[in-house]
Swiss-Prot record:
Coiled coil: none annotated. Changing residue 245 to A/E/S: Reduces the amount of fully assembled complex I. Its cofactor is [4Fe-4S] cluster. The keyword Transit peptide applies. GO terms for biological process: iron-sulfur cluster assembly; mitochondrial respiratory chain complex I assembly. It is a peripheral membrane protein. Belongs to the Mrp/NBP35 ATP-binding proteins family. Required for the effective assembly of the mitochondrial membrane respiratory chain NADH dehydrogenase (Complex I). Probably facilitates the assembly of Fe-S cofactors and subunits of complex I. It comes from Yarrowia lipolytica (strain CLIB 122 / E 150). Disulfide bonds: none annotated. ATP binds at residues 75-82. This is Iron-sulfur protein IND1.
Length: 312
């Protein structure tokens, strides 16, 4: 059976956890706080709400060998974030840049499928992971380190150790740009990366629909509180063009992400239509940015805007 290669740090953590003795705790809630409207007794005062710490004991540092690091984020899943990450990274490489792509979606890594890559990465004599290479860029993913047919059922400590190894123990060589594909949401992974790694810019991906835009605001709030520059928004699935009659249908609404970007003083890096070719090429392991299709132009535009803002 195939195992995972995050050997030393995570096995030590498992050993520590296995030695812990079970404890029994009784939790009591104040009757005054519990009601039919608020059965959990959650404080309603904004002053008591948890806040993202603005300062940490550790200053964010660049990843060794990497000149610029950007993250691709979506506070909501299913908006095509990984597709944007992959094709933007490939379009940056087409500009002559040395590019790496790091998939830090611990529980749902999809980058290996989109690149048609499998197997386990080799390791250096120093014990660092060597990224796989395809289409001219370096690729590392949690998907290379675990059994692809089994769920990653880890809790906080193991997730933290896995994330630390992906951030610290990969030998990238020398890169002009590292693109990080973040998991959806605004949880521990995003916060840890924002507070420990020097991020030169963030791309936020959204569809035009209102449900996705609500989460965009949460993502923007996270980056503002961690002092991370947002390079702009990508409006994905902006329109569907019928392949038979060329009729345009705005399935998810019209320019919702564009309007949200303008209201927050942000630019729009690009609009990507809902195109079956983009999906099918990703499933085949040959993304449109390298397959030569007309769809590549959308990601080339995004890459142009990113490179201009990064100064690379």
């Amino acid at each position: 059976m195939r195992g995972f290669r995050l050997i030393a740090p995570i096995q030590r953590s498992i050993a520590i956890i296995s030695r812990l003795q079970p404890i029994t705790a009784n939790f009591h809630s104040s009757p005054a706080l519990r009601s039919h409207e608020n059965p959990l007794g959650i404080p309603k005062s904004p002053a008591s709400a948890p806040r993202i710490p603005r300062k940490t004991t550790r200053r964010p540092e660049p990843i060794a060998g990497v000149k610029k690091t950007i993250v691709v984020s979506s506070a909501k899943g299913g908006v095509g974030k990984s597709t944007v990450s992959v094709n933007t990274a490939l379009s940056l490489a087409k500009r002559g840049l040395r590019v790496g792509l790091l998939d830090v979606d611990i529980f749902g890594p999809s980058i290996p499928t989109m690149f048609g890559l499998s197997g386990e990465p080799r390791m250096t004599h120093e014990g660092k992971l060597i990224p796989m290479s395809k289409f001219g860029i370096q690729v590392m993913s949690m998907g290379f380190l675990v059994d692809p047919n089994k769920a990653v059922a880890w809790r906080g400590l193991l997730v933290q150790k896995a994330l630390e190894q992906l951030l610290q123990d990969v030998d990238w060589g020398t890169l002009d740009v590292l693109v990080m594909d973040l998991p959806p949401g605004t949880g521990d992974v995003q916060l840890t990366i924002a507070q420990t790694v020097k991020i030169d810019g963030a791309i936020i991906v959204s569809t035009p629909q209102d449900v996705a835009l609500v989460d965009v605001v949460r993502g923007l709030d996270l980056f503002e509180k961690t002092y991370t520059k947002v390079l702009g928004l990508v409006q994905n699935m902006s329109v569907f063009v019928c392949p038979n009659c060329n009729h345009e249908t705005h399935i998810f609404g019209v320019d919702g992400a564009v309007s949200k970007a303008k209201s927050r003083g942000l630019g729009v890096l690009g609009n990507v239509p809902l195109d079956p070719q983009i999906c099918s090429q990703s499933d085949k392991g040959v993304p449109v940015a390298v397959s030569g299709g007309v769809q590549a132009k959308y990601y080339d535009k995004i890459a142009e805007g990113v490179a201009e803002q990064l100064g690379v």
